[in-house]
């Protein structure tokens, strides 16, 4: 995400450069395929933090909230639902924003989120990082009953972080 400067988020030029590199590797390694994906911030108004012409170049887009956690339940729910109506969003990441023992989940109407996710074919992530474990397992049955596809993500910021996926499937 280009607004996530603290996490080394890519500006538009970096995204374009990365795409050229992925395309070159795909040509070289065929039939092996590297998918081009990114985590994009969901801004306060529900838009994603890259323009549509950039988003259109990805195979998948995980969109998450990384700021402005203090909105009301209605505002936060509307924000997330607007984002899921983007034709480019593939997965809702960090669906409640919680960090275990550090930050409570932001207020959000998950049943409405599940309904909009199912209608727009947006998967909802189980973030398997042991500091998050978000989406809480106790609401997974409601998500599935609403017809939502579940995605398991390791929230890996390095190679060792890939091992976190075990906490999402274990």
Predicted regions and their residues:
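Charged catalytic cores and adjacent phosphate/nucleic-acid-binding surfaces used
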Residues: 2-33, 44-170
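Short loop/edge segments at beta-strand edges and connector loops
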Residues: 36-38
């Amino acid at each position: 995400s280009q607004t996530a400067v603290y996490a080394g988020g890519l500006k538009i030029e970096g995204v374009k450069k990365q795409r050229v590199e992925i395309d070159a590797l795909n040509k070289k390694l065929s039939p092996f395929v590297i998918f081009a994906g990114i985590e994009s911030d969901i801004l306060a108004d529900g838009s994603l933090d890259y323009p549509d012409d950039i988003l259109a170049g990805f195979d998948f887009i995980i969109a998450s909230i990384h700021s402005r956690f203090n909105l009301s339940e209605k505002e936060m729910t509307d924000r997330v639902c607007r984002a899921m109506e983007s034709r480019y969003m593939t997965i809702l990441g960090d669906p409640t924003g919680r960090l275990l023992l550090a930050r409570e989940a932001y207020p959000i109407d998950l049943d409405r989120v599940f309904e909009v996710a199912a209608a727009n074919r947006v998967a909802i992530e189980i973030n398997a990082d042991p500091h998050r474990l978000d989406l809480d397992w106790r609401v997974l049955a409601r998500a599935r009953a609403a017809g939502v596809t579940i995605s398991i993500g390791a929230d890996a910021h390095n190679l060792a972080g890939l091992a976190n996926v075990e906490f999402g499937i274990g």
